[in-house]
């Protein structure tokens, strides 16, 4: 009997889904604790309480697990992005919500930014291409559509999509570095308040740069 003809019982299917999620959750927790993606299969197994062989069973390798983790935690953000594009609101407001959404996603999953960059700059070209397809290209396309809409309506000055992407994402990426800077320069500061202020500042700054008079 082929694997495609095997029907799992609801209980068995739930067990498999639960094990897969436990492995992903364990990897995420370890990356946050270590502030590094240098985690071993043995450590993931110990954290999850499962056998390390299950990593290969579900994901093929540790890299496969990390890509799956990226995909899982970015899925919600990408769905929200599609919903944003369909909204009947001003392009400037769409861009505000988009940029705030990126930094909110980083805040919700603090390992996501670190993992994304590690995968994009890693030695495995197929992995780099897959991560680019899953995460980078959708964000680039979203920004391109919002920019085109804003320029067509006269809300935005003409800007290069690629340059905008690099500058806007760079500012959003820096959001993940604020904790270390703040701890060194402002002992006892309210980290959550600082992050809220940073998000608002970046959104205001980037959207203001798109105004028709900004480039004059």
What are these regions (language model features)?
Residues 19-28, 44, 69-73, 77, ...:
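Generic hydrophobic, amphipathic alpha-helix propensity
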Residues 22, 30-64, 68:
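Helix-turn-helix
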